[in-house]
Design a protein with these regions (language model features):
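Active-site glycine-rich loop that binds ribose-phosphate moieties when present
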Residues: 144-147, 185-196, 207-213
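Non-catalytic peripheral regions of patatin-like phospholipases
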Residues: 2-44, 54, 104-146, 165-179, ...
Length: 342
């Protein structure tokens, strides 16, 4: 040890010394991002310098995405550090709230509240001009106020990105700066169901069309260890058709639906969402291949619209993550657990 070195204690491991020179500053610059104004915590900087940065990819999936809350709760309880987060569709909404610094318990409480049928009805606003059944404005009005003063990526306490899809080129669009409202609104714009929006001249829809489990983006952000969560289950005969009775009742007032009655076809919402579910399950598993750990909650008994079953869905996320804990701890090196001072 000499006066030009500074020891960095790491729990019960041998003391580790980082030189007090440009190498440490370079590590800090690697961790700093143009969207993070808050100071970088020492333990996160140390993980970056030592190649142990942990990132998580939260996949899309409408109500299935509530399982992410269970995943994050287990990681938090077991002191698994998450340095950065990338979300798709419902995963983008949860990822943003997590990166904003909200506690998991508060997020779960809000999920239960928002999952009430009365709240779901409040989120319905039919579009009269935009290319989608729902305009999406009421969904925005319900969620954005929950973020409080955190309205831009620059306000977040953890690095975060969301993904959307350019419907004209098919390209994945990574969003990591500017308005959080625009970012999650683009990421949840399920084709046909929720109207797309324009950002920087690009027409954007649900990120699940191009990358439902954005593990690759987690790597691009500099994560050394990636945890990927695919919450979308394969279709199960008889379960996927239990889509909300609200939709079926609304179809009865559509004059054009008269000609399609009694022909044995699912309604428009069933066809669209079942198609998206099949796509996101298969493509999501493929996109998650590069992750170090893959968490797949068993949500085969649920449907995409059952937000009112939030408690059960979150429990499935907890169960799946607990099963993967030994591997997660091994990958993040919990033998040398970081003592958090954040």
């Amino acid at each position: 040890y000499n006066e030009n070195s500074r020891p960095l204690p790491i729990s019960s491991c041998e003391p580790f010394v980082l030189r007090n020179d440009a190498s440490l500053m370079n590590g800090a610059l690697l961790l700093a991002t143009p969207v993070a104004h808050s100071a970088v915590p020492l333990h996160r900087l140390a993980r970056k310098v030592l190649g142990q940065t942990v990132g998580i990819a939260l996949g899309g999936g409408a109500a299935f995405g509530l399982a992410h809350l269970g995943v994050l709760q287990v990681l938090e309880r077991n002191q698994i550090p998450i340095d950065l987060v990338v979300g798709c569709s419902m995963g983008s909404m949860i990822g943003i709230a997590y990166a904003a610094g909200f506690s998991i318990s508060d997020m779960i409480e809000k999920a239960h509240e928002m999952g009430k049928r009365s709240k779901m009805i409040m989120g319905i606003d039919f579009s009269l001009s935009a290319p989608g059944v729902l305009a999406g404005n009421r969904l925005r009005d319900l969620y954005t106020p929950l973020l409080g003063s955190k309205q831009r990526f620059e306000d977040l306490v953890k690095p975060c990105r969301t993904v959307a899809t350019d419907i004209e080129s098919g390209e994945r669009v990574d969003i990591g700066k500017g308005s959080l409202e625009d970012a999650y609104r683009a990421s949840i714009a399920v084709p046909v169901v929720i109207s797309p929006i324009k950002i920087d001249g690009r027409v954007l829809v649900d990120g699940g069309v191009s990358d439902p489990v954005p593990a690759e983006v987690v790597r691009d952000m500099g994560a050394d260890i990636c945890i990927a969560v695919n919450v979308v289950p394969p279709l199960k005969k008889g379960v996927e058709m239990k889509v909300s009775q609200y939709v079926r009742q609304l179809a009865k007032i559509n004059p054009f639906s008269f000609f399609a009655r009694d022909q044995g076809f699912p309604n428009l919402f069933d066809i669209t969402m079942n198609s998206m579910q099949t796509l996101q399950h298969e493509l999501g598993n493929f996109k998650a291949i590069s992750a170090d750990v893959r968490v797949n909650p068993d949500l085969s008994e649920f449907t995409w619209i059952e937000y009112y079953r939030s408690e059960e869905i979150i429990a499935k996320g907890i169960e799946a993550t607990e099963q993967m804990l030994p591997l997660i701890k091994k990958k993040v090196g919990m033998a040398c657990e970081w003592k958090k001072t954040e």
